């Protein structure tokens, strides 16, 4: 699982969106925050864990402060491997960077007002978009099927998942 962050700045207000994508299935998750810290990194990871359709065994991040202290300690307690990208090598993050671009083009650019002035509504809309992204939006790299359908088809998941019916 590759985890990254996006930030936006407007009218003296800074907002952050943490993002994560699975290299194999393309499963994508994101959440917006008003500040960036290792506590928000931990909160994001716990939210990711609660919705991820499989057990996360390893994560890859940059050296951002959001991936230190509380985030790092939690991963250690859970026995999850934590790999770091080389500094100033965004190509190590290619898949999450591409997913971030899709997020910006298909969702973020149309919801900037909520990101800055109503973060709760922004995150509610973001969750709706992520459901679409993971269950309905075709992905060329997955044979033009969405990530959760790919998981069901290729990884032996039960077809009783709500997204499959």
Q: Which residues make up each language-model segment?
A:
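Mobile-element integrase/transposase regions
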Residues: 1-21, 27, 40-43, 54, ...
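Mobile genetic element proteins and their domesticated derivatives, centered on retroelements
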Residues: 4, 20, 26, 45, ...
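Short small-residue beta-strand/loop micro-motif enriched in glycine and branched aliphatics
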Residues: 27-31, 83-85, 109-110
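C-terminal domain-tail junction helix/linker
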Residues: 69, 78, 102-165
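Short amphipathic alpha-helical segments
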Residues: 71-73
């Amino acid at each position: 699982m590759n985890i990254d962050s996006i930030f936006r700045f407007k009218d003296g207000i800074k907002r952050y969106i943490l993002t994560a994508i699975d290299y194999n299935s393309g499963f994508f998750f994101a959440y917006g925050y008003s500040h960036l810290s290792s506590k928000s990194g931990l909160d994001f990871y716990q939210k990711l864990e609660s919705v991820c359709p499989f057990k996360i065994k390893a994560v890859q991040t940059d050296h951002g402060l959001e991936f230190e202290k509380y985030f790092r300690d939690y991963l250690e307690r859970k026995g999850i491997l934590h790999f770091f990208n080389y500094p100033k090598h965004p190509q190590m993050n290619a898949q999450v960077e591409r997913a971030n671009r899709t997020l910006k083009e298909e969702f973020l650019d149309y919801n900037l007002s909520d990101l800055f002035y109503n973060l709760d509504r922004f995150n509610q809309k973001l969750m709706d978009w992520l459901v679409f992204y993971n269950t309905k939006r075709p992905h060329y790299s997955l044979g033009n099927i969405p990530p959760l359908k790919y998981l069901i088809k290729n990884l032996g998941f039960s077809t009783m998942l709500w997204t499959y019916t």
